[in-house]
């Protein structure tokens, strides 16, 4: 069927229009900049979406031949420290720069140094010392068996028994024995001193045995023998038993039963009451003061065989002296006691700690004045003891007002020489025994 003239003319017109459109499209694409060409193409059958026009990110990504070319400047990586650079193996390298000292004639202050002189002043060498920090730390934390040498045992046992504190306990016991009325019996005095010393060693050893987990957290006690593992807990308990049994036996059989009972009661009070109470209540300070006040009473009972008013006066002096002594000491160790988990006045009640210290400093004045009233000393004693009692009271007042480390240290160091001097003055001013009203000490 032959096409009509109208159909032929329509096809011819359509072909001309299509050719014109193709020609214009071709010219437009050739005249467009090359950098916008990828926005008009269908690459890898992916049509243009609105994501390509997100100019807020300031990032232009060209996807050609299935590869991405990022035209944004990469973010700089953090610069490692030049002094310590950790490697993957846990080691560390420390660089130590050794600089040659500048010689005075090398540079003149009147002219500007040139580049060659500045180069000469640079470090001569850089020494790199590889320190195996990770390995050393691992070796330090590794468990090591500590072998006990025989010649080290006396020193370890001395630290276990707190030999300095034991010496102070024995000296106060000796002062109580010497201040008691009646003749001085040397065999009884020696037995009392030995028995009291053994009882003190036993109490201190048991105290350290119970407080190992807490002493390890304190700088003041972290080097104790049980904490460091220098001796076993079994050896510590065995040593305490070997001290407690003969000590109490000597006091009971060699001196008198009253003194032995006081020694046994003091061991119980220190180990079973004071030691656990340190982590429960601040009342441990008052209980500990009672423990420290019993030794001079034991010395008095060893000489007289009875509890008189003079024994309680000596116990009261030791009781009051311990508060300024210990409260001032604990004030500088508040962080240590907190780390160890102990409940101390200086940590939980700092105001009460200072008030109690001042209160008992003033109590020493009253107790010293009561000594001649009870016929223990002459009236010369309170007069001679007035300066040292007034001085410790002044330091107690400064500690109460200032509440700082300096005032606490001054009060603590004053208490160290105050007690020996006060007891020495009491012995010097002791009232002579009249008429033999006190018989010889019982065997």
UniProtKB/Swiss-Prot annotation:
Transmembrane segments: 174-194, 235-255, 257-277, 280-300, 309-329, 364-384, 411-431
Catalytic reactions on record: heme b + (2E,6E)-farnesyl diphosphate + H2O = Fe(II)-heme o + diphosphate
Pfam family, any one: UbiA
Membrane topology, record value: Multi-pass membrane protein
Coiled coil regions, renumbered to chain: none
EC class of the enzyme, as a word: transferase
Keywords: Disease variant, Heme biosynthesis, Leigh syndrome, Lipid metabolism, Membrane, Mitochondrion, Primary mitochondrial disease, Transferase, Transit peptide, Transmembrane, Transmembrane helix
Biological process annotations from GO: aerobic respiration; copper ion homeostasis; heme A biosynthetic process; heme biosynthetic process; heme O biosynthetic process; leukocyte differentiation; lipid metabolic process; mitochondrial fission
Lyase as UniProt keyword: no
Disulfide bonds: none
GO terms of molecular function: geranylgeranyl diphosphate synthase activity; protoheme IX farnesyltransferase activity
PROSITE patterns: UBIA
Compartments in which it is found: Mitochondrion membrane
Keyword Lipid metabolism attributed: yes
InterPro entries recorded: Protohaem_IX_farnesylTrfase (IPR006369), Protohaem_IX_farnesylTrfase_mt (IPR016315), UbiA_prenyltransferase (IPR000537), UbiA_prenylTrfase_CS (IPR030470), UbiA_sf (IPR044878)
Principal location listed in the UniProt entry: mitochondrion
Record's GO cellular component terms: cytochrome complex; cytosol; mitochondrial inner membrane; mitochondrial matrix; mitochondrion; nucleolus
Enzyme nomenclature, EC number: 2.5.1.141
Family: Belongs to the UbiA prenyltransferase family.
Disease: Mitochondrial complex IV deficiency, nuclear type 3: An autosomal recessive mitochondrial disorder characterized by cytochrome c oxidase deficiency. Clinical features include muscle weakness, hypotonia, ataxia, ptosis, metabolic acidosis, poor feeding, delayed motor development, anemia, sensorineural hearing loss, and cardiomyopathy.
Function: Converts protoheme IX and farnesyl diphosphate to heme O.
Annotated PANTHER family: PROTOHEME IX FARNESYLTRANSFERASE, MITOCHONDRIAL (PTHR43448:SF2)
Identification of the protein by name: Protoheme IX farnesyltransferase, mitochondrial
Organism: Homo sapiens
Lineage start: Eukaryota, Metazoa, Chordata, Craniata, Vertebrata
Encoding gene per record: COX10
